[in-house]
Amino acid sequence: MNKDMLLLGIGGAGTIMTRGVLRAFGSPINAHAADTDAASGAPGDIPFTLIGGSRLAGRGSGGQPAAARAAFDDDPAVLDPAFDGIRTCVVLTALGGGTGGGATSGILKRLHAHGISTLLFATLPFSFEGHDRERSAKAEAAPLAREADVSVFLPLDELVSEAGTDNMSDALRQAHDTVASGVTLLWRLLKKPGYIRLDPERLHAAIIGAGRARFAAAAATGENRVEEALAKLAASPLLARTSGSAPVRTILVGILAGDDLRLSEVATVASGLSAAFGPDAKLELGTVNDEQTFSGRLALVVLLFEESPAVATRPARSGERALASQSRFGDTSKTTWEGEDLDVPTYLRRNLTLER
């Protein structure tokens, strides 16, 4: 098992989603989970680190981000053994209170101190959970958007809208499964590449300092499977541009199919995504040819990297202080326009709901 990439689940929901990826992938993944609640690691099916054991005694943070933050700050090196040899870390977490909201920022900083690039997927609470949870999630999202190389924020309201059920437990499970299935496709693309290779090193280079992104996946079968999968992506609110979105700078797409994948299908995907989401955007494309998993089926996984109006100042990674991006942007001051701080994402500044 190649260990240059790490899948890291933070908090209870992050751990659940990480387990979902492990189940869907079907073969060993370099994964780890961390939580203030010892019960999250009780199944013993995934390497687990307890955060703040001396402070919280494994009882969890009680939904208090400040408690989780303090617990991680007590011992910020607690996860360091899991970071050894890692180049890129995919982080799964949930915002709106608790360990995910409180500890993720500190963990991202620690990852960057180790020279590790980070791709963050964070769910946002249901709207019915109230203004306190919503305000907490927004306050937590701002530093995460600065600390992560790429941040993808996924509102549970919108994930559930694709689940097609009104049952509470089923909807939440399917929302987590939606995130897990998309991340699984991304992982499979990077770890089991086909004729057009999109390997972890290309992802590492693509995400460094990239900023915000949109993310979705779709699958279809039959004679018109490419057109159907593209139509699903075009209709997905996860990829829709809103008033809080910036133009797309880079389209990263994976095409996963069996041995029947055709060159014409690859060309249709490339042209269709460019036309729909960014005709001037750079296209990074990779394929997976896996007859056992995708026989007769075609799946697409897409990351849309948005243009960044400003680059937040962040300590340089170990060994990367000479990068041109650091020297160009390291000393920039706050960008303001009519009293608004443009370094803060628009959806946070203007209290907008993230839409897919």
Predicted feature residues:
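Tubulin/FtsZ superfamily GTPase core signature
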Residues: 1-356
